[in-house]
């Protein structure tokens, strides 16, 4: 995990203030997915332990975060099926259960980044670099996209990082964010997921350059686990 000092971000005409947080240095790999979810659980089309996991839904990812947290400390579970936050989401059984997901801010808990956190980190955090892509204005230096990917995902960390040392933020796989597409500004605690698209950022191995720009976003159904270019990376609140 990479420390990201908080600050302010302009998203269009809206100023967002962010506290310190941490973001995964890389997208979550297939090796980490299997370590958490169990042997044989890897859903990815393009297989390889150091490739990003793909073909995961937003619901799958929320369940992964909770299971990872439970492995560390059951008290670090942060996603729940009820508004009183007493029923942890996705610790067992089917991973794509319909319903709302409620987030309880929990120090040290792994979670999905918000769209604002993702974009702020991609721009270099406090440095807010004036670049088109995460780390460069030249996309092929920092991202796997339609021009250089050989039409498949690639192992993590092979290209240049951005100013914070984060790899593959643009290209390789789209990354799920916590936020509902319809909520501006986003609700940070409750996600009524039925029929509400979620935001993905960064573009993918299949994307044209314009879709990999930091400012661009995509949205899709939270149940969708069929695309071999949907992945994610972890975030968490910063703790000393």
Where are these regions (language model features)?
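A short glycine-rich, aromatic-capped structural motif
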Residues: 1-42, 49-70, 170-171
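Structural recognition of the beta-strand scaffold that forms the well-ordered cores
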Residues: 2-3, 54, 111-113, 119, ...
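Conserved beta-strand positions that form and line the central face of beta-propeller blades
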Residues: 3, 8, 44-45, 52, ...
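Short, well-ordered surface patches within globular domains
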Residues: 9, 48-141, 176
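Short, well-ordered junction/capping motifs at the entry into regular secondary structure
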Residues: 96-105, 141-170, 221-222
